[in-house]
Regions:
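Short, flexible loop segments at the rims of nucleotide/cofactor-binding pockets, characterized by
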Residues: 2-5, 45-48, 106-111, 130-135, ...
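Structural motif
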Residues: 23-24, 127-129, 153
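Active-site-proximal beta-strand/loop segments in catalytic clefts of secreted hydrolases
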Residues: 28-30, 71-74, 101, 133, ...
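Active-site catalytic loop in hydrolytic enzyme cores
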Residues: 76-149, 164-165, 172
Length: 215
């Protein structure tokens, strides 16, 4: 029932952006979690949820011929967890997974979420994307790994806005930056660090066209 409610909620929310026929939808950090749940109940929910929400987004990506950046907690075979962004292509396939490199102390100590160690760009039909989650925004080593890979777009799923660090990372990597933030301003930033689109207090989503042929 909890999983059904979550899927129904996202099905309604996606109707705000799907009429614009997007090539890419970026979802906020841990987008299918009930944030008011204590840790034990949260872990019970993950067991019941399994991959059902992921499969829902895979079906949506396929039916609407778009990429979806799906951020969620994943349980690993050893019983530990990762805070991950999974990139789904228009054929409904997972083409890459990024594990948050810099989880918070609360995540590691309470939720048993371990840090990822890789920072590899993921190839999509339109170009290369670099993923980052929440506090990753503040740690230079991650971004120095990404810089020589020349990503076209940075996908930032977060519960934390980060302020001007968003613009700085876009400028430093000379990359577009898309910020999808829980209950805060969502942004599209160009490769020179200018915010070119953002959500408002009236609408919690933003759609925008960007030109990846500018180089």
């Amino acid at each position: 029932l909890e999983t059904d409610r979550m899927i129904d909620s996202w099905n309604r929310l996606l109707q705000n952006v799907l009429p614009n026929e997007p090539n890419l939808i970026v979802l906020p950090e841990i987008c299918d979690q009930y944030y008011n749940y204590p840790v034990p109940r949260r872990h019970e929910y993950y067991e019941v949820r399994g991959n059902r929400v992921r499969d829902f987004f895979m079906e949506k990506a396929y039916k609407n011929s778009c990429h979806i950046a799906y951020s969620a907690v994943r349980k690993m075979d050893d019983g530990t967890f990762r805070n991950s962004t999974q990139i789904i292509n228009p054929r409904g396939e997972i083409v890459g997974i990024y594990n948050k490199n810099h989880p918070t102390i609360g995540e590691t100590e309470e939720d048993n979420i371990l840090p990822g160690k890789d920072a590899k760009v993921i190839s999509c039909d339109f170009g290369k994307v670099a993923c980052a989650i929440c506090f990753d925004l503040n740690f230079d080593p991650l971004w120095e790994k990404y810089k020589p890979q020349s990503p076209d777009i940075i996908l930032f799923s977060s519960a934390y806005h980060g302020g001007l660090m968003q613009n700085y990372r876009a400028y430093r990597l000379r990359s577009y930056f898309i910020g999808s933030i829980i209950d805060l301003e969502n942004t599209v930033i160009n490769p020179v660090g200018q915010t070119i689109a953002k959500s408002t207090n009236y609408f919690g989503y933003v759609t925008h066209d960007i030109n990846l042929d500018y180089k």
